[in-house]
Regions:
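Membrane-helix interfacial "entry" motifs
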Residues: 14-19, 93-97, 101, 124, ...
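Juxtamembrane/interfacial segments at transmembrane-helix boundaries in multi-pass membrane proteins
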Residues: 15, 21, 30-86, 90, ...
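Short beta-alpha junctions and helix-cap segments that line functional grooves
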Residues: 19-20, 146
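Transmembrane alpha-helical segments of multi-pass small-molecule transport proteins
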Residues: 69, 133-149
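Membrane-interface helix-loop-helix modules in multi-pass inner-membrane proteins
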Residues: 1-6, 75
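C-terminal ends of transmembrane helices
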Residues: 5-14, 79-93, 142-162
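Short hydrophobic "helix-edge" motifs at membrane interfaces and signal-peptide entry regions
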Residues: 67-69, 98-99, 143-144, 156
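Small-residue-rich segments of transmembrane alpha-helices in multi-pass membrane proteins
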Residues: 2-4, 23-37, 97-98, 102-113, ...
Length: 178
């Protein structure tokens, strides 16, 4: 809601469309992420992170695959993982500079941090199962969005797409940990 208001009221250009787009994408991503977190808590029998890590080995491998998929899509939407990336560049281009900096510099990193702290230690078998499709999506971030970035004529859209492309490199480094 705050992002919607900051972009929708204080933004420039096609700010209303960008505000709606970011709200819908991040809202749907949050719902998917919430489903994964609730399933993870039910699989471990607790919402306490310390107990959850201790019980992570008892999660059924089939459940790990499903939970990992939900966490990848949920956190991937926040990080603007390809193909859930189309909200980022228009939002950054329409947002006031401080709002764009907040999203690109801080909020996207929450998605990566969530993967590092939750997905990797709690559902490692599920992440291993999804590693190849994840690498294909990461290549989409790096190659496709890189091509879109190079072809941009507007600097604000170029910077927005560049941020998305660089998240692919960071996500790729995290995938190397799996």
């Amino acid at each position: 809601v705050p992002t919607f208001l900051m972009i929708g009221i204080l933004g420039r250009g096609d700010r209303r469309a960008a505000a709606w787009k970011i709200t819908i994408y991040l809202g749907l991503g949050s719902i998917v992420l919430l489903a994964g977190l609730v399933w993870l808590a039910n699989a471990t029998g607790t919402y306490d992170m310390v107990k959850m890590v201790a019980a992570a080995g008892s999660i059924d491998p089939a459940a790990q695959k499903s939970i990992a998929a939900l966490l990848i899509v949920g956190f991937g939407t926040l990080v603007s993982l390809f193909p859930f990336h189309s909200w980022a560049a228009p939002a950054y281009a329409s947002a006031p500079a401080p709002v764009a900096m907040l999203h690109a510099g801080v909020l996207k990193k929450f998605g990566l941090y969530g993967l590092l702290r939750l997905a990797i230690p709690l559902v490692p078998e599920g992440l291993e199962f999804w590693l190849t499709p994840l690498l294909v999506l990461l290549l989409g971030n790096i190659l496709w969005v890189g091509w879109v970035t190079i072809s941009q004529k507007r600097l604000d859209l170029m910077l927005g797409n560049s941020s998305v492309m660089h998240m692919g490199y960071i996500f790729l480094a995290i995938a190397a940990l799996i």
